[in-house]
Amino acid sequence: MKQPFQKRIHADTLILIAAAVLLVLFAISEVYPKVNDAALPKPLAARCLLLVLVCLISYLGGLLRQMRTGDRRLTEWLLTAYFILYVYLLLSLTLMDETLRLDPSRLESAGCTKREYYMKWFVNFRPFDSIWRVYVQGFMDGRINFGYMVLNLLGNLCAFMPMAFFLPRLWKLQRRWYVFLATVVLSVAAVEGMQLVLMVGSCDVDDVILNAGGAFLFYLILKIPPLARLCDAVWTGNFAG
């Protein structure tokens, strides 16, 4: 007598389903407040943690699928999707966050146009001026604490660091240091330019210096042979070589 057909669900499939559920939850948390005009807090740490969790779980599922089938296309597709998610999060934090918009009450008391106010208080074209005046002098004068200074400077240094992993593996031309550096500088400058046009956040040449400098430093670090081999293994899913 024939046994009834039973379809086996592999562990990698269950893991990928779990990652998909978490991704849906992330998407809902991003869209729901905008649809309902609700001032729901979306802490940066929680958003980043959820997105990192999605990436780690889905990568594990893709790796197990590759080990089972020998097909690495899913792993490479997932890593490309992670790059897209990273770019979305970056643009969301720099251009679309409601906290970046000017406070209308300040404009009323300033007695000037929105553009004039923004250009006066949120634009800096002098290299290292904000780093020195806002952070170093601010810390020395007691206006900001050490933790705030370090967190903001490190945040700017780390913001574009993932580019050092993704760009050279997505496009071979980006493996040349000068091409990578030019791409990152232009990308950061484009974001700062959009902030200037949209009048959100601050348009600051020091952000270009810190963002691009951090990305290029990480690029050089990942060029160290053991780290370069590890990054290639992560990208291909082949840790045996």
What are these regions (language model features)?
Residues 2-199, 219-241:
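Bulky hydrophobic segments
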Residues 178-179, 205-209:
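Hydrophobic alpha-helical membrane segments of integral membrane proteins
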